[in-house]
Every structure is written in C-alpha cells, then in structure tokens.
C-alpha cells in the first residue's frame, strides 16, 4: 500500500550530500500500464536501497504494491533534483511541460514505442543509471514553445509545448483559412487542414509525419509545416527560434478551431482570433548517459542504413 505524503512536509530539496550529485529523485510513469508499474517498483527498490529519497507521482501510485511517498507533479518539480519518467515520449512530454518550470534534471526509461526522449532500457537500467547518478552524464537543454490565443486584443488562453503547437479544425477535419506572419511580416495566406509549428525536439514527431525536416536538437530554430495545403508550391519553412509567429484565423471560417500543444492541451480558437507562438523562457533539462549520440538514436529508431565499411 502507498503512503501519501504529509501535507505539512516543507516543499524543499534535501540538505546537500556532496558525495551524491542527486539527492531526491521523483518517479513518474504511464498510468494503468503494467510494464510501467513493474519498472517503477524496481526503480523505487533499487534507489531506496542506495539511500536516495524517492517520491512517486500520484497518478501511478494507486497501482503500486510498495511503500512510497505519493506527491503531485508540481511537488516533484519543487523537491527533486532528478525526475525519472517511465513510459513513452508522450509521457515525457506531459511531464516536461510542468518540470521545465523547475531546476530539475529529467531522464527517461522507455516503455513506449520509438522513444526518442527516453534513453534507458526498462530491463537492465541499473548499469547506465548508476553511472548517471555517479555524475557520468551529458546535459542537454531543450527549449519550449509558448502558444497564446488572442481575441479582441486580449489573451484568452495560453499553454506551453515541448514538441509542437498545431492549429487545426475542431472535431471534424476540413480545410481552414488563415494568414501567417513572421515577426509581423506577412509571409502568406493558407488554405489547408492546419499548421504545425515545431521545435527541434518535435521535428521527429508530428512534424516529421507531415513532411517536415528533422532538426538536430542543438539548432535554435523552428519549423512551420502546413498540413495538406491546397497548393502544389507550399513547403515547410525553417525560421529562427527567436521569431514570433502569428497565425490570423480568417473570420470566414465557419466553425471553431483549436490549438493543440503536444496533442495534450487544447486551446479553443474562434474565427478572427490570432495565435501567437514564440519561444518560451522555460527550458527542459534532459540528461543522457555518457556517449549519447543523436544520430545513433535516429539510425536506430528510424531504421536508417548502417555503416558500409
């Protein structure tokens, strides 16, 4: 049975122990997934045996058969030095949008499909994780997007995205009309099923499926990918990450639209609204085992050809 966290417990990180790079570790997982539960239990037992303080995210806590401290995702961000996300890239994205607000390192254990963001294997994670906990890791910062819906000069809704912000029809797929501005300069009008604005992190996700290029994570750039544009000449375009992108929805659109952030959060959009998408001040601090190679990940996940000689 789980032990809920004491509500009177101060939300502060542990007193530093100079012999350990990380002191308090949060475990986050894919809810209602047997494999994830097994991995979290193994991680919890392994980490506590080595003297770490371990917190478990409350959404997965009800299904575990060990004693633990159950807390919400915000408290993990406030109290932990390291968060381990067990699941697929979707679970990593959901956690990352919250954890990016805090100075907490994040690493993933892959219990999903491709797993571009989750480095550690669910079986035999101990060797690599021990090296990471011992200070042998590489740090990588990924920037986020901030998406805002403006209506009559006021911000009506906003959220952040690690992968992409997508303007699209609501419940029924159909063509929509909108104008695209980059740093207040008109680029073009579009008649399409929508527009994907992606970070380099998201360039191997929805953007890639829609025909966008892969951007290496260190690039300070965004890629705009029209979705099924009603023209033969429109192609994805890469712009500087410091650009402000404005999508102006035509008042002639007959139905309400949406902006999706990483496919998790949906912002309602009305005809005539303006969507402002820019680089967020928040950054996700990913850590990888030593020797992490992005092109090895691409080659492995996408089935690219191996060396010829």
Swiss-Prot record:
Predominantly, its location class is cytoplasm
Q: Where does NAD(+) bind?
A: 89-90, 163-164, 174, 191, 193, 204-209
Q: Which InterPro entries match?
A: ATP-NAD_kinase_N (IPR017438), ATP-NAD_kinase_PpnK-typ_C (IPR017437), NAD/diacylglycerol_kinase_sf (IPR016064), NADK (IPR002504)
What's in the GO CC field? cytoplasm
UniProt keyword Nucleotide-binding present? yes
Question: GO biological process: any one?
Answer: NAD metabolic process
The GO molecular function terms of this record are: ATP binding; metal ion binding; NAD binding; NAD+ kinase activity
Q: What is the annotated localization of this protein?
A: Cytoplasm
Instruction: Please state the Enzyme Commission number of this protein.
Output: 2.7.1.23
Q: Which UniProt keywords apply?
A: ATP-binding, Cytoplasm, Kinase, NAD, NADP, Nucleotide-binding, Transferase
What residues sit in the active site? 89 (proton acceptor)
The cofactor required is:
a divalent metal cation
Q: Which reaction does it catalyse?
A: NAD(+) + ATP = ADP + NADP(+) + H(+)
The record's comment on protein family reads:
Belongs to the NAD kinase family.
What this protein is reported to do is described as: Involved in the regulation of the intracellular balance of NAD and NADP, and is a key enzyme in the biosynthesis of NADP. Catalyzes specifically the phosphorylation on 2'-hydroxyl of the adenosine moiety of NAD to yield NADP.
Alphabetized PANTHER family for the sequence: NAD KINASE
Q: What protein name does the entry list?
A: NAD kinase
List the source organism.
Shewanella denitrificans (strain OS217 / ATCC BAA-1090 / DSM 15013)
The root-end lineage is: Bacteria, Pseudomonadati, Pseudomonadota, Gammaproteobacteria, Alteromonadales
